[in-house]
Structure formats: structure tokens, C-alpha cells
A protein has these predicted regions:
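Signature of Asx- and small-polar-rich beta-strand/turn repeats characteristic
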Residues: 1-202
Length: 202
């Protein structure tokens, strides 16, 4: 097929892309007694904006922290101290796959045509009841790959959706083991329709 031929050439068609906006987030507690020294804004905190009377949802994709400047003003920043915070349009969605027996063909297709593949986060849990997980990294960010590397690749499936692929212990790293749970988190987006927002409200 055209899709498989394109993948053989190292190409995978782009998915929809979430609109992004840069904002400065502040919290003013001047005059408030017993305020905390530091506040945290969790990842996936929601904001909304309206364009032509249509409301769109944006959100953070990482936790942000802010420290009292001494006057009750807090400016939120990311882990690198950057106060120019990026909000992404979209709705967070989660898909889980249970890894079958060795030798079985494992298929991890995300049946969502609105997926922004660039926002994908892949976590592998040892079993369905644990909260601890191993993060997997996009193969595009690999510097060195061996049989123990934990990478994933997203390609287009024949039905037009996107498929998650792992290594086999030889090609591009380690595949999730039998009995583990693969959890995929991503943003479902409307694409360019959400461009142009000016005012964002929590």
C-alpha cells in the first residue's frame, strides 16, 4: 500500500496539530495572610478561549510552580524556570493496551483521527494494579539505541489511524513484556480551527 511504502522510506504522514499559545500565568495574593511560599499548577490544568462564539479548551502539559516574590505575587514557570508558558489546545485522552503472550502479534492502534501524535506520552506498567511505570521515549529523540532501550515509534495504520510500535530487543530497543499494560496519553485536537484566541480563562 501507499502507507507501507511511505513507512519503508522513513516517512509517516503528519497528524492534526494542536494550536499553541504562549502566556504568562500569575497569582496575586497580596494582602492574604498565611499564604504559602510556593504553589503548584498541575499538568493538564484547563483554560478556555472563545473564537467566533465557539469555546475551545487549552491546557498545560506539565506542572508549573510559582514562588512568592515577597509581596504576594506569584509567577508560574516550568521546570527550566521559563515563565513563557505554552498552552496546547485539545482534550486529554488515554488508551490502554494489555500485552499478550510472546510470539503473538501485538497491535496497538489508537482509533482516533483527531490525535496529535506530537503530544503522545507512553507509559508501561508492570501490571494493571500498580501505579509505577516505565516511560518510553519517541525513537526520533534517540541518540544511542541498544536492546535495552525503551523507545516507541508512531506510524500510520492502513485504516488511517495511528499505530504504536516498539522494538523487538534487536532493532530499536525493548518491547513491553507479557502481562504489562501500555498506556498512551495524548491530546485530541480540532487543529487550526482554534488559532486566534486572545483571552484565556481558567
Amino acid at each position: 500500500s501507499i502507507v507501507s511504502h511511505a513507512q519503508g522510506l522513513g516517512y509517516s504522514p503528519r497528524s492534526k496539530t494542536s494550536s499553541q499559545t504562549n502566556v504568562n500565568l500569575t497569582l496575586n495574593l497580596a494582602g492574604v495572610s498565611n499564604r504559602n511560599t510556593t504553589y503548584t499548577l498541575p499538568a493538564f490544568t484547563l483554560f478556555t478561549t472563545s473564537i467566533n462564539d465557539i469555546t475551545y479548551t487549552f491546557q498545560t502539559t506539565e506542572s508549573l510552580t510559582a514562588t512568592d516574590n515577597g509581596s504576594g505575587l506569584y509567577e508560574f514557570s516550568d521546570v527550566n524556570g521559563n515563565k513563557n508558558v505554552i498552552l496546547f489546545e485539545g482534550t486529554k485522552r488515554t488508551k490502554k493496551f494489555y500485552v499478550g503472550k510472546v510470539g503473538e502479534r501485538q497491535i496497538y492502534v489508537i482509533p482516533d483521527s483527531t490525535m496529535d501524535t506530537a503530544t503522545t506520552i507512553v507509559k508501561v506498567f508492570a501490571n494493571p494494579s500498580t501505579t509505577e511505570f516505565e516511560p518510553y521515549t519517541p525513537i526520533s529523540k534517540a541518540i544511542r539505541v541498544d536492546q535495552n532501550s525503551k523507545f516507541y515509534q508512531i506510524t500510520e495504520a492502513p485504516n488511517g489511524f495511528y499505530e504504536l510500535n516498539f522494538g523487538d530487543g534487536i532493532s530499536f530497543g525493548q518491547a513491553p513484556e507479557t502481562g504489562t499494560v501500555v498506556q498512551v496519553e495524548y491530546l485530541s485536537t480540532v487543529g487550526a480551527d482554534a488559532n486566534g484566541g486572545q483571552v484565556f480563562s481558567p
